[in-house]
Structure formats: structure tokens, C-alpha cells
Amino acid sequence: MKKTVLRAYARLIAEVGARVQKGQDVVIEAELDQPEFVTMVADACYHAGARKVTVTWKHQALEKLAIRRESVKTLQTVEAWERAKLQHYVDTLPCRIYLLSEDPDGLRGVSPEKMARVRQGRYGVIKPYRDQMEGRYQWCIAAVPGVAWAKKVFPNETKARAVEKLWEAILHTCRVDDDPIAAWNAHNADLQARCDHLNSLGIASLEYHASNGTNLTVGMIPEAQFCGGGEYTIGGSYFNPNLPTEECFISPKRGEAEGIVYSSKPLSYQGQLIEDFSIRFEHGRAVEAHARTNEALLQKLIAMDEGSAYLGECALVPYDSPINQTGILFYNTLFDENACCHLALGMGFIDTIRDYPNRTLEEMRALGVNDSMIHEDFMIGTPDLAITAHCRDGRTVPVFRDGTWAF
């Protein structure tokens, strides 16, 4: 891949994704196999005005080794230096950039039960720091091809060709063309126009139907609004948290989901694929879940904590999105969630609530924004998916027909 194209992608991540501000600190999190591209992103951050760029290196094989060899108690412990680092982030609010390149199968063989217990044990310590930073800093998740990931996506190609093809797919779906920044400005404007229309309807609930058996109604929070593309921090900084993105999303009202929904794509979770699954909801809670493969893992996901059995997101993505048109299953939620409509179990987004900077976290939970240690997207979009809005004034308005926008 030409370095000029990769530098354009790095600039896109720094200037449009994270929207690094002059004088701001930046923290980049990446795997050890990506030093060249991480250097490009760091350089782009400095050019955007970053005061300091720090890289936190990860190595999936070491993470797997630690999970297998260390005790649950050791893994659950949040050391003093970790707390100090989290407090430093609260105090300085650095911009955060996450570069994904991990092997989708890299944690295969690790006990899901052990991982869940570790996550549960650490969550109580980390959550107060996370809550203090909520909505106050920019962040961006983007992707870089790792060899194992590329071979998973393109198993019949050589390693080099698989990486090249995955680069091509990432750059295409991220609109890295002759002028990617202009392309993203136009894309954000289109997504915002769709969100504005949806928000003008006064939606009380969304009703989903598809020939695969999906028959689900999800209630909306009156104070919530659809968001898409870029978003603002409480301080007014505009950024794009996901590259790519094709969704208009909203956090539904906890406790208001009735019916059943069927997946349309596999869910890659903890190094394993959950395939051909369904989830049935009563009074907002997932009360029944079945899957052709890894049903027990799906049920453990739903039982992770009190909030993991409730929905935290409804996202509208046309079935003919650029990502779905590639025909590629990326085995990575960042991409696969933008291939078609999806829902998410777990944590909702407080920034979907109108005037959220002037509300307390407790007020937004009381409105119905779900809280959980997890946020797991799963795809439900099909070529015949129909979504109908039931509005607070009594109107019934088509939102999706035949898998795509009805307006």
C-alpha cells in the first residue's frame, strides 16, 4: 500500500476522527505489529497541534497468556499505578485513539467464565473514573490490518495479499479517496440530515419486522435523539468516534422492548463466533436466547451484569451500505455493525439525550438510558427488514422498507 495513501488515512484519524486540538495530549493504543502506521498517526497528531503523544502498546498473545496463567484475583486487581493513570486521564482529558488489528481468534481457548469474572471484578473500580470522563473528551476507533485478521477475512490468499486486500477494504469503507476530509464532511452532513428528520417525528417506539422471524417493538426515551457521524464533547469539540460509520443511532428506553429478534450476521465475541441466534425480550429484558453455535456463550454475555440483558442502542444502517456492498465479513464489530441495522446489549449512550451536558448521570439513568459494563452490537439487518415508527402524536411512519431508508 502506498505510503501517501496511508498518511492520508493517518491524517483522517487525527483530524476528522479524533479531531486533535492544539495543545491537547493524545494517547494511542495499538498492537505491537503496527509500529509504522502508529508512527504515521502520531506524526499526524503532532501536525494537528498535539502537545504530547503517548503510545500504549498491546500484544494479544501476552494478554492471552496472562489470562490463562494468572489467578482471577490477580487479574481483577487494579494496581495503584493503574488508578493513578486513570486519575491522570480524568484530570487531563487526553484524546484517545484506538487502532484495532487483533486476530479475531486470538483469545480462542481462554475460559469465557474467567474473562467474565475478571471484567466484573475490575469494572467496579474503573467505572467511577469512566463516569467522570463521560462526554468530556474525543476518541476514535479505527483499524489497521493485522496478518492473522487478514487471513481470517481472506483465508485463500497469501499473507501479503490478504493484508493488501484488507487494507483496500478498510480504506474504501473509510472513504480514503482523493479528498477524504471533504468526503467525510459530506457524509457527516448526510447522516445529520437523516437524524434531523427522524428527530422531527417524535418517535415513541420502533417496530421491526423481517421474514426471518424478527418481530420486535422497542420503546424510545422522549428526551432522546438520533445521532450519527460526528458528535460533540461537553466542551464543544466535534469528532468522529468511529471510522468507518454508516449509522443513525439512539439509546432506547430501558424496560421497553417486546418480542423476538433474529441475527443476520455472526457475532464475534471473545475469540469465538456466535452464529444464527435469536433473543426474545419481555418488559425490556432478554429472557430467552438461542444460537446454532455457542449458545452458552451468548447466554453468558446476556448474564454479564444487571444491565447486559437490556438494550443500549438501536442503530439504523441501510442494507446497501458501502460496507455491506463489499460482501466481506470482517469479523470485527467496527465494520460489521456498519453493514446493516443492529442492536446492542448493555450500556446506552448518554450523549443521545438532549441537553445532556446539563443533566446529571443519575438523571439520565432515570430517563431510561441503560448502564452496563458491556456494549455488544449484533446485526439484524436483512434485505426485507421493515422498521415502522409509532409517533407520540399517533402517526405511523415508515422508516425502513426492503432493508433501506424509506425517506
Regions flagged by a language model, labelled:
Residues M1-E258, A389, R395-P398, W405-F407:
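Active-site bordering "gate/hinge" segments
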Residues R11, N199-L201, Q270-Q272, G307, ...:
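Short solvent-exposed loop/turn micro-motifs enriched in small/polar/acidic residues
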Residues A14-V16, R194-C195, A204-L206, C248-S251, ...:
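Generic recognition of flexible, low-complexity loop/linker segments
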Residues I250-E306:
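Long, well-ordered mid-to-C-terminal structural blocks that present hydrophobic/aromatic surfaces
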Residues E256-E258, I274-D276, H283, A309-E313, ...:
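Active-site lining segments that contact anionic ligands and/or coordinate catalytic metals
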Residues A286-P357:
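Dual-mode signal for accessory low-complexity, basic/Gly-rich regions
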Residues E362-F407:
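Extended hydrophobic packing segments that form well-structured cores
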